[in-house]
Amino acid sequence: GKADEIEGAKALQNSMSLKETETFLRNATPGELLTAYGEANPKRGGMTRVFNDGYVMGKEGISEPFVNDQMPRVPIILGTNRYETKLFNMMNRRFVRWGEGEGIFSWIGVDELPLEIMRPDFYNAVTQYSSDSWKERAADTPARQLVASGYKKTFVYRFDWDDLPVIQGVDYGVLAGAAHALEILFLFPAAFDNFIIKNVVIRDSYDGAKKLSDQMLSYWAQFAYTGDPGKGRSNDLPKWK
């Protein structure tokens, strides 16, 4: 590098012109750029950060396209799962006691499973508040901003499915229902034919889950074709409003 320590690097960077900065970055290798990004602070401080470079991302930040009606726009679907943060809370040992898997789980190599939600009311409260905040920031507010700025091709959903079984005494509907990433299963219907998913994860809810998957795929395919989920590709579902 051009500096031996952080303060010297900051001073050097602040003294560089935009052209010098551009030249320096364009001459860096992909490996150097990714290494610097990976070592940036705060580490593990959240999702990948967005840089307001004024080109890829507007100078006003990631929310600018939602309020600036002069920027190019395309139809958009925004959405979250009802209990997004359950995926993370269930792995927090302060909330959930984990232990050795039994029966088929031991046989297929699952070393640990959730055995008890230690404080269910607290677990549910933490999940509700944090998931509601996620929904407000990721779906509701951007959608309202788009509509308020005159853009009507804006659609919102919430994924609520939580019909999961009881496993080793733990109600997985409470533990992980409608959690982050659970909806992905419904977008790849071949997964429903997987033995573990069909007979362990979904069990008695298979028919309902498959129907929901078919409806989601129909709406989303129609959106991809036309920019409006409407009544789905089959044109026989409730109109998305």
Describe the residue ranges of each PLM region.
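Acidic/polar loop patches that form or flank catalytic/metal-binding clefts of enzymes
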Residues: 2, 34-36, 152-157, 226-238
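Short, charged, surface-exposed loops that flank catalytic or proteolytic processing sites
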Residues: 2-24
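Short alpha-helical patches at coil-to-helix transitions and adjacent helical residues
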Residues: 5, 139, 213-217
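Active-site nucleophile loop of the alpha/beta-hydrolase fold
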Residues: 1-2, 82
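Non-catalytic, well-ordered alpha-helical segments in soluble enzyme domains
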Residues: 208-231
